[in-house]
Amino acid sequence: MSYSPTLSSGFTAGRNSNRFISPPSGMCSFCSEDCNGTCEIALAAVLGARTVYPITTGNNQIASEKDYPLDYSHFNINGRVFGAEGTDKGLEELTVFDVKLNTEYGSKNKIQMNLPIILPALIKLNWRDYFGGAAMSGVSCVIGEDARNNDPNLVMNNGKITEFPLLQEIMDSYYPYHRGFGQLILQCNADDNFVGVPEIAIKKYGYKAIEIKFGQGAKGVQPLKRLKNLEMAIEKQAMGCLVHPDPSDPKIKEAYENGACPSFYSCGRFPVWTEENIKIHIEDLREMGAENIYFKMAGYDEADLERVLRMACANEIDMVTFDGAGGGSGYSPSKMMNEWSYPTIMLEQKVVQICKQIKKEGLLLPAITITGGFASEDQVFKALALGEGYITSVGLCRAAMAAAMTGQKIGAQIKEGKIPPIFQAFGKTVEEIYSDLPDLCAIYGKQALDFSTGAIGVFSYLHKIGFGVQHFGALNRKFDVSLFHTEDLIPLTLEAEKLMPLK
């Protein structure tokens, strides 16, 4: 049995020409010279190296297609009929609504959230409603790396950013709905640091939280982007980007003019952190005015996982997000999305084991988020339970953006009188059909009726996630999210049982 996809994919546009497949290679078992060329090999034969990355990126998001042999579906959720933990209420008074989902984190500056949910780094598609919906839901959310590349009004002088109006636009999409729960966080990679993104974000635009990026589950290296011509290569280099080959080299210019120059690529810088230089960087961020510092880490080698956690402990980092394989991205190498990193469930187990060792040493651990392929409340509950109290929140990125996009699109259809058939039984207007609008009105008053339906979509989706988690908490007679544990899970396979702690 092969766990990897064939040479067909939803995001490479490749298609095997028939249904008979050779599992080891993913090729058609019968490969003919009469084939019109639709598979990934045919694409590579014509488009070459650019097919390392998806050729379909744009107004979409993409994710791993590998069918991993172990995931959260290998567990069922336990249930109990006796007792009640985490509440002072009498048993005869308790309902599902009594399960407390609110959490708090932060080493120096405490952040409260209404849900054990984080919306991880993103800065494409319907980002306004993604961030606005996060604020309405009372959860923290992260602006993705390289946001500067999305700002047509960006201004740079002497290699440093002096104007970054997109940062203000993002704040304006978040803070009108913010009511004291959650935080808006700006993720910065090595290139962002190089051109001064943290400095201008904190000093000019008033950002209070920075996430330092080590990596993400869909790509363990920074992306390479093909550039159309010499002019674009020179422009990117002037903005501080690494460009290959070097467009300022006279020999490269001459080769380009003669039509004999290889393709240009902008190359993201690798993070080069040590215990010493990251300490200085964090101190600098705090001196600038940052109140909370976060880490974003992928499923790298186990020694690297431990090293990052120890860096977090040593520098009083507020939260570390670990991103496993199986999630998605806006732009990552196709095979890297499928074929690298610990799958999220295995990454979570590794992180928990490391946390146990660090805790034995008496060190204070940061809050920890696990993300990578989560979309429903059963998955969120299982991740929190398997985290044994060390995992304090779950990241929902692609799913929350899907809610922002569909919430916006369906709202527009309703306003045009083109109600999708599935929703026609629920009413004729946005107010009638969007069922959680009364909950938003209870918070913001009737002005919520005028909110963007994309942001309402994110709020409604996260409301559903929280409500579903409350059901599973009540099912196990645990009325506080902090009490969820592995005893609340039933392993269905031997592989799943091996992930459970020894009793």
Indicate where each model-derived feature is located.
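Glycine-rich phosphate/ribose-binding loops and adjacent secondary-structure elements
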Residues: 257-441
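Short histidine
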Residues: 400-503
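Cysteine-cluster motifs in flexible loop/terminal segments that predominantly coordinate metals
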Residues: 17-50, 361, 406-407, 412, ...
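Terminal peptide-recognition signature
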Residues: 134, 320, 480
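Active-site-facing alpha/beta catalytic cores
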Residues: 121, 128-312
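Structured core elements
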Residues: 118, 142, 185-187, 211-213, ...
